[in-house]
UniProtKB/Swiss-Prot annotation:
One of the proteins required for the normal export of preproteins out of the cell cytoplasm. It is a molecular chaperone that binds to a subset of precursor proteins, maintaining them in a translocation-competent state. It also specifically binds to its receptor SecA. Homotetramer, a dimer of dimers. One homotetramer interacts with 1 SecA dimer. Gene3D superfamilies: SecB-like. Belongs to the SecB family. Keywords: Chaperone, Cytoplasm, Protein transport, Translocation, Transport. It is found in: Cytoplasm. It comes from the Bacteria. Its main location: cytoplasm. GO terms for biological process: protein folding; protein tetramerization; protein transport. This is Protein-export protein SecB. Pfam families: SecB (PF02556). SUPFAM superfamilies: SecB-like. The gene is secB. GO terms for cellular component: cytoplasm.
Length: 160
C-alpha cells in the first residue's frame, strides 16, 4: 500500500508593519506649496526562514514626493510590511515562487494602505500605489540571475 501524499499547507500566521518612517524635511513651509509633487516609488522584497517551515516575507516601499521645479523633497515615507507564513509540504523548487510572488501579493494591499494612511495623516493628499506584478518581477530576477551567474543561487530581493 502506498503512503498518502501530504497536501501542501500555506497559512498566514501574521501580517504586521515591521518598520515605518516618515520625513518631512521642509515642514511647515512645504505645506504652502501649490505645485504637485513628482512621486517616486522604490519597491523591494526579501524573505528569511524563521525556523523550519515558518518564513518571514517583507515588502519594502520607499515613496519620495519631490517638487520638481524647486528640487525639494516634500516627504519621504518608507514602510516595511511583513508577514509570517507557515509553508509545509511544498516541493523545494516551488518554495521560491511562493515566497517571491504569492506572499508579496498578499502583503502589498496592506503596504498600500499603510503608505496612504501615513501620508494622509502627515497632512498630504493620499498616495495610492498602483498594483504591482510580483510574478513578472520575480521572473525577471530569475532571468537576470541565470544570465549573470548561472552557478549561483538566486537572490530573491526585487527592485521596482
Amino acid at each position: 500500500m502506498t503512503e498518502p501524499q501530504q497536501q501542501p499547507v500555506f497559512v498566514i500566521e501574521k501580517v504586521y508593519v515591521k518598520d515605518l518612517s516618515l520625513e518631512i524635511p521642509h515642514a511647515p513651509q512645504v505645506f504652502l506649496e501649490r505645485e504637485s509633487p513628482e512621486i517616486n516609488l522604490q519597491l523591494a522584497t526579501s524573505d528569511n526562514v524563521i525556523e523550519g517551515e515558518i518564513h518571514e516575507v517583507i515588502v519594502t516601499a520607499t515613496v519620495t514626493a519631490r517638487l520638481k521645479e524647486k528640487d525639494k523633497v516634500m516627504f519621504l515615507v518608507e514602510a516595511h510590511q511583513a508577514g509570517i507564513f507557515r509553508i509545509r509540504n511544498v516541493p523545494g523548487n516551488e518554495i521560491e515562487p511562493v515566497l517571491g510572488v504569492l506572499c508579496p501579493n498578499i502583503l502589498f494591499p496592506y503596504l498600500r494602505e499603510t503608505i496612504s494612511d501615513t501620508v494622509t495623516r502627515a497632512g498630504f493628499p493620499p498616495v495610492i500605489l498602483n498594483p504591482v506584478n510580483f510574478e513578472a518581477i520575480y521572473q525577471q530576477k530569475q532571468q537576470e540571475a541565470a544570465v549573470s551567474q548561472p552557478d549561483q543561487p538566486v537572490d530573491n530581493t526585487t527592485r521596482h
